[in-house]
Amino acid sequence: MQQYKHDFIEFALSRNVLKFGEFTLKSGRQSPYFFNAGLFNTGRDLAKLGEYYAKAIQASQIDYDVLFGPAYKGIPIATTVAVALANQFDVDKPCCFNRKEVKDHGEGGNLIGSPLKGRVLLVDDVITAGTAIRESMEIIQANNATLAGVMIALNRKEKGKSELSAIQEVERDYGCQVFSIIDFDDLVSFLERSAQYTDYLPKMREYREKYGIK
């Protein structure tokens, strides 16, 4: 596991964004862990979050022209990622996000920031059902742009209603790759190396066996 992945897990744990225990998900599944990126909610937290996204984007070597953050959660993520890329890697990329409600006055339209054109890297926290991606694709296509890829914080790597995960369905439907700062296997690797959290390993392995993608 790359060092930035390990550091991101520790960062998420320190902010209670990542928790191990027993949790009931919206799907009704009993999960041995929970991830809520909304708890990265201070200036310092958001700055660090942007740095981890930037490191993962650079590591992915994805070719893109513009960052796009889908409303609402993707908006602060895209903003802090754009700043981190410029500050850390001298990569100065334009940034764009959408409104949920279309304005008919002022600058109008449903996009704020740079024009949405060329190869678009969509940034968000997680992909649960893929709904936000599908809505974003409509916006990207309406602007004659192309989805270059997606970067999220966590890939749960678990099956949805079919044998595929929501992420695999997105990759299949739109012919793009979904990258993540960390995934479920990284969490397991972290637990295997951490004396503090080893008690959670059996439940995590059991969950992967039951719901993990093959």
Swiss-Prot record:
Pfam families: Pribosyltran. Gene3D superfamilies: 3.40.50.2020. Orotate binds at residues 34-35, 128, 156. The keyword Magnesium applies. GO terms for cellular component: cytoplasm. One of its GO terms (molecular function) is magnesium ion binding. One of its GO terms (biological process) is 'de novo' pyrimidine nucleobase biosynthetic process. Its cofactor is Mg(2+). Pathway: Pyrimidine metabolism; UMP biosynthesis via de novo pathway; UMP from orotate: step 1/2. PROSITE patterns: PUR_PYR_PR_TRANSFER. Keywords: Glycosyltransferase, Magnesium, Pyrimidine biosynthesis, Transferase. It catalyses: orotidine 5'-phosphate + diphosphate = orotate + 5-phospho-alpha-D-ribose 1-diphosphate. 5-phospho-alpha-D-ribose 1-diphosphate binds at residues 26, 72-73, 99-100, 103, 105, 124-132. NCBIfam families: pyrE. Belongs to the purine/pyrimidine phosphoribosyltransferase family. PyrE subfamily. This is Orotate phosphoribosyltransferase.
